[in-house]
Regions:
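Membrane-anchoring hydrophobic helices of lipid-metabolizing enzymes
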Residues: 1-87, 100-102, 109-111, 130, ...
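Non-catalytic C-terminal accessory region of glycerolipid acyltransferases
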Residues: 11-13, 148-312
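Short, flexible loop segments at the rims of nucleotide/cofactor-binding pockets, characterized by
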Residues: 31, 64-69, 140-145, 180-182
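Catalytic core of membrane glycerolipid acyltransferases/transacylases, capturing the structured
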Residues: 42, 87-143
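Residue-level signal for well-ordered alpha-helical scaffold segments within enzymatic catalytic domains
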Residues: 62, 102-105, 109, 156, ...
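Short, charged beta->alpha transition segments
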Residues: 70-79, 118-121, 151-154
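Residue-level detector of flexible, active-site-proximal loop/helix-junction positions
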Residues: 78, 121-123, 139, 209, ...
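Short coil/turn connectors at secondary-structure junctions
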Residues: 84-85, 111-113, 160-162, 199
């Protein structure tokens, strides 16, 4: 049996590889992440978890400072007035790691507790636990049971004044067939259900930009993993492995740059309440986010972007 030689890696939780993947897939993901500068980020993570997290102050804003990523927002933030209702923040998901940290850096400026709905595998980073609600995207009975419990917990927290952050796509935006503008993956019904059950108002946010061309090209066949047929499944799983391995590379590309975000007017519960049909409500939330997108001229998306200097 072939055994892959591996070296001890600092902070193994800072990886998208997981024990449920085949050994070859884990090795490949680790290799690409290493070439993308993962170990440099591990050193910054070590400083962040020891020196920043214990203070409880600007935890995510200071994380962005460490990795030299700015957040450029033309709108007033925090908003001058917030409704006296439970509050949900909903955003698109163009980058993966970068917009996740950016939205949390904005949420912490509201001066109230907050949680983000994230993939359960990301809770390997223990420092994220106090700020997270884990979602299981596998379609098992246990996953359904877990997600129902998480939804009930989210509603309870909303009623207690905790802001909940949701990326309704549940995954990183992808360009159709690898070219053109990236599009959010189909939105899940979860946020509409959450808003209705908690009678929450919503702050829509739109993050501009997208990952590099290579990320989208390798993502093209990922849906084949759900098809019948060994060849289709193999191609689909290989695509997912390649896509996953590039997420840290895409995060590294943001270093030295600013993420542009636009914030819409608060969608009050009184405005959303008449939308009893959840699909209609979800469509309204979707428009609330993507109506904020700036009208940009078509631009060339780099296949292999210039290497960016990582923060020391």
């Amino acid at each position: 049996m072939l055994k892959m030689k591996t070296r001890e890696r600092p902070f193994p939780e800072l990886s998208y590889a997981n024990p449920h993947q085949p050994a070859l897939a884990r090795w490949f993901i680790h290799s690409v992440e290493g070439l993308s500068g993962r170990d440099r980020f591990a050193a910054l993570y070590d400083f962040w978890r020891r020196q920043v997290v214990p203070t409880g102050e600007r935890v995510f804003s200071r994380m962005l400072d460490l990795i030299d990523v700015g957040v450029r927002i033309p709108d007033q933030w925090p908003p001058a007035q917030l409704p006296d209702t439970p509050l949900v923040i909903i955003a698109n998901h163009p980058f993966g790691i970068g917009d996740g940290i950016a939205v949390l850096s904005l949420a912490e400026q509201l001066g109230r507790p907050f949680r983000v709905m994230i993939h359960k595998d990301l809770l390997r980073i223990r420092e994220m636990e106090p700020y997270s609600l884990p979602i299981d995207f596998s379609e098992t009975k246990d996953a359904v049971k877990n997600n129902m419990a998480v939804r009930h917990e989210a509603v309870r927290l909303l009623r207690e004044g905790v802001t909940i952050v949701v990326f309704p796509a549940g995954g990183v935006a992808t360009a159709p067939k690898g070219f053109g503008r990236a599009r959010d993956l189909p939105w899940k019904m979860f946020p509409a259900r959450l808003v209705q059950e908690a009678k929450a108002s919503v702050i829509p946010m739109h993050f501009s930009g997208q990952n590099g061309r290579l990320f989208h090209l390798v993502s093209g066949p990922m849906n084949m993993a759900e098809r019948d047929g060994r060849v289709a499944k193999f191609v689909g799983k290989a695509s997912l492995t390649l896509r996953t391995s590039l997420l840290i590379r895409e995060f590294a590309r943001l270093s030295g740059r600013a993420i542009d975000v636009r914030v819409g007017n608060v969608l009050s519960w009184s405005e959303l309440e008449p939308l009893r049909d959840r699909k209609t409500l979800l469509d309204r939330l979707y428009r609330g986010v993507f109506d904020l997108a700036p009208s940009l001229p078509r631009r060339r998306i780099p296949f292999l972007p210039a290497r960016t200097k990582l923060a020391a």
